[in-house]
A protein has these predicted regions:
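The feature marks the mature, well-folded catalytic cores of soluble enzymes
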Residues: 1-408
Length: 408
C-alpha cells in the first residue's frame, strides 16, 4: 500500500494559498503527521505492507532517466519563461536524490532559489513559488490506481495536481519494485482521476465521470482494461455536482477540494466504497438515484447499455442478487455532514474489515450494525483536504477476494 506521510509541503499552506492549493483551511501539520502515523500503523497491524511515497521517490531519483522525467514535469510549467526554466533545470540537475525529492514534493520559493535571474525571477515575490508544493500528494489513490498487475496513472484535470501523476509515473517506470508492471493509462491523456475508479468485484470496474474524469478518458481506460483481460464490465457512473440543500450540513461557501457531492465535482469513491463482497457504503441522497451505463467489449468496439439504476447495474455485473447499501447517515442533515467529512471514503482491507476516521461516528455505527469490523483512526487534520482513508492509500497488490482476512 503506497501512502504519503505529510511533510514540509503541508507547511507551505497559508490562509492566502488555501484555495490555490485545494485545502479548506490551514492544517496543523504536527497533528496531521501524528494522525497519519496512526493510520499507517493500523495498516501494518492488519497485515498490510506500507510503502512510503517519499522513500520510493528518493530511490527512483538515483536513476538518471527518472530524474530527467521528473524534472521535465517541473520545467513544463509555462509560467517559468525560458531564462528561469534554464536556470532552474541546472539547479535541479545538481541536487542529490534526497534533496531533489524534497524539492519536487515541498516546492521551491524565490527566496530559496537564490541564483535565479531574469524578468520572471525579478517579478516574483520573495515567498512566491518557483516550484509549487504538492500538499495533495497525501491522497495517493488519486494519482494512480492498480487494476491487477496493471497500473493506471491519473491525468488530473486540475493543473495544481498534474505533477503528482508525473512523479508516480517516474516511480512506476524506473523503481525496481515495479519492474514488469504494465501501464494502462498515462498523465498525458484525457483527464482521469484515480478516485473515480472503484473495483466492485473481480472483473467489474466502476468509473465516475464528471468534473475529474471525462467520458473520453473512461472510453480509453475501458478499452485498455478489456484488452488486458482484467475486466468484463466497466460501469460508467455520472458524478456531476448537485445544488447543496439547506439541510445538507455542507459548510457555507464550500468548494470541493478532493471531491464532494454538493456544489462541486465528486470522486466516485466519496459516493460509493465497497466494504464487503456484496455491500457498499453510499451517500443516501445518491444511493437510489445514481445511474450507470454498462460497458462491455465486442468485436467492433464497445457495447454501451441504456442508463440503469446504479444498484441494479452493479448487481447484474457482479453476479449477485443485490448490492447491499450501508448509508452514511440517518437523515439529509446527518448524511450531508457525513459526506463532507468523507464518511463514505472508507478503506476496505478485506471483506467486512474497513478503516474509517473516528470522527465519522454515525457512519461507523452503521457499518458495525451491518457486520463490518471498523478500524477507527484519528483524522481531524487529515480531513482538512476533504479526503478519507481510501483516498490516502494506493494498493499495489491484492490477495484474492475469497481470502477471509484480506481483500480488495
Amino acid at each position: 500500500m503506497i501512502v504519503h506521510r505529510p511533510g514540509a509541503e503541508l507547511k507551505r499552506i497559508t490562509p492566502r494559498s488555501c484555495g490555490m492549493l485545494l485545502f479548506d483551511r490551514v492544517p496543523w501539520v504536527t497533528r496531521a503527521q501524528q494522525e497519519h502515523d496512526a493510520f499507517a500503523q493500523a495498516l501494518r497491524d492488519a497485515g498490510t505492507e506500507v510503502l512510503y511515497l517519499t522513500e520510493l521517490l528518493q530511490d527512483t531519483m538515483e536513476y538518471v532517466p527518472a530524474r530527467q522525467q521528473a524534472v521535465a514535469s517541473v520545467l513544463a510549467d509555462t509560467r517559468l519563461g525560458d531564462e528561469l526554466r534554464d536556470q532552474l533545470g541546472q539547479h535541479l540537475d545538481g541536487l542529490d536524490p534526497e534533496t531533489l525529492s524534497q524539492v519536487l514534493i515541498a516546492g521551491l520559493t524565490r527566496a530559496e532559489f537564490r541564483t535565479g535571474r531574469g524578468a520572471v525571477y525579478q517579478l516574483l515575490g520573495a515567498h512566491d513559488f518557483v516550484i509549487d508544493p504538492l500538499p495533495n500528494l497525501l491522497f495517493t489513490r488519486d494519482s494512480s490506481v492498480w487494476l491487477g498487475d496493471n497500473v493506471a496513472v491519473a491525468s488530473p484535470a486540475r493543473p495544481g495536481r498534474r505533477r503528482e501523476a508525473w512523479l508516480m509515473q517516474a516511480i512506476y517506470d524506473h523503481h525496481p519494485r515495479f519492474a514488469g508492471s504494465k501501464t494502462l493509462y498515462e498523465p498525458s491523456l484525457e483527464p482521469l482521476d484515480g478516485g473515480d475508479v472503484v473495483l466492485l468485484a473481480p472483473g467489474v470496474v466502476a468509473v465516475g465521470t464528471g468534473g475529474h474524469t471525462t467520458a473520453a478518458a473512461l472510453e480509453r481506460l475501458a478499452r485498455r482494461v478489456f484488452d488486458a483481460g482484467f475486466a468484463h464490465t466497466v460501469l460508467a457512473v455520472p458524478t456531476e455536482p448537485r445544488p447543496a440543500p439547506m439541510s445538507s450540513g455542507t459548510p457555507s461557501g464550500a468548494t470541493a477540494r478532493r471531491g464532494t457531492v454538493y456544489g462541486a465535482p465528486a470522486h466516485l469513491d466519496t459516493i460509493c466504497t465497497m466494504v464487503d463482497t456484496d455491500a457498499a457504503v453510499m451517500h443516501p441522497a445518491l444511493a437510489y438515484t445514481l445511474t450507470a451505463r454498462s460497458i462491455s467489449p465486442r468485436a467492433d468496439g464497445l457495447r454501451v447499455s441504456h442508463p440503469q439504476p446504479f444498484l441494479e447495474a452493479a448487481a447484474l455485473a457482479m453476479g449477485i442478487d443485490r448490492l447491499r447499501v450501508i448509508d452514511t447517515g440517518l437523515d439529509p442533515a446527518t448524511a450531508g455532514c457525513g459526506q463532507w467529512d468523507d464518511g463514505g471514503n472508507t478503506l476496505a482491507l478485506g471483506p467486512r474489515l474497513a478503516v474509517s476516521f473516528e470522527r465519522n461516528v454515525e457512519t461507523n455505527a452503521r457499518l458495525e450494525a451491518a457486520g463490518i469490523e471498523v478500524i477507527r483512526v484519528p483524522g481531524s487534520e487529515l480531513a482538512s483536504d476533504r479526503g478519507g482513508p481510501r483516498g490516502m492509500s494506493c494498493p499495489v497488490g491484492r490477495d484474492p477476494v475469497s481470502t477471509p482476512d484480506h481483500g480488495t
